[in-house]
Amino acid sequence: MKLKTITAFFAITWAVSTTVSAQKVSIYSTTSTERWVEKKQTLDKKTAGQADICVYPDSLLQNVVGFGGTFNELSWDALQCLSPAERDKVMAALFSEEGIHFALGRTPIGASDYAMGYYSYNDVKDDYTMRNFSIDRDRYILIPYIKEALKLPPDLKMWASPWTPPAWMKVNEHYSQKSSGIEGTEVGHNRLDPHRNLIGNVTGFKMQQGYLQAYAIYFSKYVQAYKQNGINIQMIMPQNEIAWTPCWPSCTWRPEDLAIFVNQYLGPQFEKDSIDTEIWMGTVNYPNPDYVRTFFKQKDSDKYVKGVGVQWTGMRALPAVHKEYPDYCYMQTENMCGNSENDWSALENTWNAVVHCFNNGVDSYIYWNMVLNETCKSWWDWAQNTLIIVDRKTGQVRYTDEYYLMKHLSHFVQPGSRLLKVSDDKNTLAFRSHDGKVVVVAYNPEEQERPCSFKVGSKYIRVILKGKSINTIVI
């Protein structure tokens, strides 16, 4: 009897050992010439010597809310050059389970710099009760764009922010902060008299009570109007790029004044109208953490604000801000715009930003323009980067390197995933996915391929990382 028990024990042990050692791992690799190459590889029994990178699957860090992209008018305009079938393919590449599978979407409240010109939802001067508020323009452009995305992941979470209030609410009564005549090579032609420029540490909004209350109603009506059109705005940030003064739609806010608007007007208005849309502080594009510190020092700043949104130029503030205010959620709100490089260097910049942001507390990451035409230009003539380029003349669709970077991340790292601790936090990120798998994303910045051994808990695998490659290993 004892002999049979021992024999059975060794048989079971051998079977388990064989199963573990034979476990297949999925590896996906992308270079500038070979995109999304998939292969299967067997786990090693043990790696010789110490592993190059250790992943600690039991060291769970922040929850991941997800990755996303931004809906802009010029993106939808570019998509109209495609046949319905080709347009569906592009949308699927961004939002379906087989594509990037974005979980989040950002949309502007009124005109962004990638709108087809300036507009707001109420340009009737001194309409403090918002009787003339209307989102009619969005019903033809942004709302159809968003609804096409919602056909794929119906639980896509949307958030929004304005680039500018209606011009009549601003001190210079213009949608921008600066005349395009002094912008060097940028030719937005905004027709702003340079004497009306708003530059420096100023608030561009008229801080009188009537304007503040009207603007709070403006936000409330926006959220309600979008809900009536089938789009739930789950979070808003009161201003895009709080501390920048460009020649396109913009409005600067001193932190003390932004706190007054949020704490005394916007938050109470949402309460009055029974709106459960979250209010976040942002988007912060100031690299000095003092902006956030000053905001949170104001009375009642912790009453309504649920999180902090940091734009790429404000990423340097993240380490200090997250350490000092650990109880808030953090989002990277806008990926680096670039200058239409749309090449591997753009991928590297974005990868470095993703690593920095997740290692400093963000739980969500938003790319900027998902689709642009072949010029990649904004209405104000700045050519920027994108995930997908549509050539209006040929109908050709090009997927850029950054598209594949986003796919290497978001395709596997969905809401409910957790960031994991790793021994090399410069070129490696690891997550425990929502379905329990470990997802390791590793970048090889060298020109030459290199072998790299990974230890994930008690599991080992040795992978050849191609030169200049982004890789996802699913264990």
Label each residue range with its predicted role.
Residues 1-24:
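Bacterial Sec-dependent N-terminal signal peptides
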Residues 33-233:
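N-terminal catalytic cores of secreted or lumenal carbohydrate-active enzymes
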Residues 65, 98-105, 153-157, 229-235, ...:
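Loop/turn elements at helix/coil->beta-strand transitions in domains of secreted/extracellular proteins
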Residues 69, 101, 158, 236, ...:
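Conserved, mostly hydrophobic/aromatic
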Residues 72-77, 111-114, 164-168, 240-245, ...:
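Solvent-exposed loop/turn segments at secondary-structure junctions
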Residues 213-341:
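Active-site neighborhood of glycoside hydrolase catalytic domains
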Residues 332-404, 421-424:
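Aromatic/acidic polysaccharide-binding cleft in carbohydrate-active enzymes
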Residues 422-457, 462-464, 468:
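Carbohydrate-binding surface patches
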